[in-house]
Amino acid sequence: MNHAVHNKLVSFIWSIADDCLRDVYVRGKYRDVILPMVVLRRLDALLEPTKQHVLEEVVFQKETMKFTEWDDKGMTAASKYVFYNTSEWTLQSLHGSATNSQQILLGNFEDYLNGFSANVQEIIEMFKLRAQIKHMANKDVLLDVLEKFTSPDINLTPFEKLDTAGRKIPALTNLGMGYVFEELIRKFNEENNEEAGEHYTPREVIDLMTHMVFDPIKDKIPSVITIYDPACGTGGMLTESELFITDEEGKIKATNTSVYLFGKEVNDETYAICKSDMMIKGKDPEHIKVGSTLSTDEFAGTKFDFMLSNPPYGKSWASEQKYIKDGKDVIDNRFLIKLKNYWGEEEDADAVPRSSDG
């Protein structure tokens, strides 16, 4: 992606907060609107070309087949993605039909959100997006924000388009969208220093980790790789690992290697960012799970080729110990290891660390 275009796009999105959200949100809460709206606009843009096909599938399932619930296979086949939207609306049509009534716009916007498939509904809930659009409508800025995100002067779509002056704006690839999203996250993290350490690992640290893990095997990269991060945050470590392996301008250049990313994140908003980032980049979003890695194990029995992580060191996890130990007995097999005793016989050993390393 052209860096000048990338920087212009990030700057435009960043300016939306100052132009529309000042005095509506405190500065530290701008991200609560901007990040989910970026995700929403991108997903909306991806679905636009197949919108009519999805609406035809809606009629077929509802009127011809008399289905009481949507058949996901039919819907995703129509949308060409693992997600879909069954409403009549797009963000462009919401803006195009808007009047001065913020409440009418709010009602239409809610219908639009309700039309998304279950995997996107989860992201909407985690972002608390319905509450945000209601707040913006009540403050008379919802239309202003929508106008910015559908402006012809920025391109969050995967297609080349013309701006208001007739100049071509390049298409935004999935990789380019990932760069834009990660740059926005980085800027918001810098703005909110008190939160940065909770879900952000500096890019140079991730770069060092990927070198340490993958450099030694750069000449032995298999055709299929699985990578897991049990405290994945916004997914930066996962996506950077894949990029380090497959980048045609990188050291390894394993462009034909299929990389499958898996992660788990305990914070709802951070999980939503990670999962939506995977969607935006065309990865399988169902490989990202929400919850504590310590208390639940959605990947039980799964083996991964590599694991990279930067867990929240210094944070007590005493409240989750009950899921791992019952008194002195270890009840989670992940924390039992086989060790040989003095006579060379294998025995189960307790590998549970202290509940606080602070």
Roles of regions detected by a PLM:
Residues 39, 47, 75-77, 83, ...:
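Aromatic-residue hotspot detector
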Residues 1-217, 287-298:
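Non-catalytic, mostly N-terminal accessory regions of nucleic-acid modification and defense proteins
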Residues 18-21, 165-166, 190-196, 227, ...:
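Glycine- and acidic
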Residues 168-177, 222-227, 254-261, 353-358:
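Glycine-rich, flexible loop segments associated with nucleotide phosphate handling
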Residues 14, 83, 271, 317-318, ...:
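Tryptophan-centered motif/residue detector
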Residues 199-309, 314-329:
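Conserved S-adenosyl-L-methionine
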